[in-house]
Amino acid sequence: MESDLTTEHHLPFIRIHKNGRVERLSGNDIKPTSLNPQNDVVSKDVMYSSDHNLSVRMFLPNKSRKLDTAGNKIPLLIYFHGGAYIIQSPFSPVYHNYLTEVVITANCLAVSVQYRLAPEHPVPAAYDDSWSAIQWIFSHSDDWINEYADFDRVFIAGDSAGANISHHMGIRAGKEKLSPTIKGIVMVHPGFWGKEPIDEHDVQDGEVRNKIAYIWENIVSPNSVDGVNDPWFNVVGSGSDVSEMGCEKVLVAVAGKDVFWRQGLAYAAKLEKSQWKGSVEVIEEEEEGHCFHLHNHNSQNASKLMQKFLEFIIS
């Protein structure tokens, strides 16, 4: 029998064993759905891709089920989780709890998307799956979507890798003339990168830059010809055209102690200077780190970010 001794450590994400088995070190826990209201929200899982055994987790405010549906539909939020394309899922407690809070705060129907993870499924699998999920949602294949979703108020959101995915879904929606159109996109601490610092304030040390490059080039996207300058990852500096962004407005959230801080600001500036006709808003928390709102959701700054999220959806 082949040995299962660990041969590669990629902390804090995974271990790859000698026999090829991938051991994920976090993001594996699953929180069950419930049609009995939990914090006044009901939830369910629905498969959207039988080919790849992928599902979405849907969250609905319980009070919406009591409304006369005529004229009372609610915003639809499509959410892409983070985790460096390697870990996490819509079913993990951290994302289940976060989407529950978003839904009850913003009174929206949320659809949290599962996508295939690297290294078993390198990029662009995550992008392909995410677009397939959007197409499935827009095909009105689910009763909650048909009964409660207002397709004049469709939003996309994500954090970290999920924010990167959200950007690319917005671009594809614009290029492919997705109809109805996306009203807005929220990108929280978007995972954009490049071989060189984006500006004089992007002062990550060599070890950090090397680690991010190694993870992208060896685990997430080993077939990238340009490494971390791959346009999937280097949205700001690769010459990617953002003018076809297929939504009306974008909210970019950045954190001053996040390695992606300057990239996020540069992305917002690039979008604003492009030929895109929409509006860009930035919210910045200088003393916070990457995805702080997921791990300290009761903090003042997390509440501030949630309030901005709410205002973006209802305005």
Curated annotation (Swiss-Prot):
Q: Where is the active site?
A: S160, D258, H290
Q: What SUPFAM superfamilies does its record include?
A: alpha/beta-Hydrolases (SSF53474)
Q: Tissue-wise, where is it found?
A: Expressed in flowers and siliques.
The record ties this protein, via InterPro entries, to: AB_hydrolase_3, AB_hydrolase_fold, Carboxylest/Gibb_receptor
User: Function, please?
Assistant: Carboxylesterase acting on esters with varying acyl chain length.
The record's family statement is: Belongs to the 'GDXG' lipolytic enzyme family.
What is the name attached to this protein's record?
A: Probable carboxylesterase 3
GN (gene name): CXE3
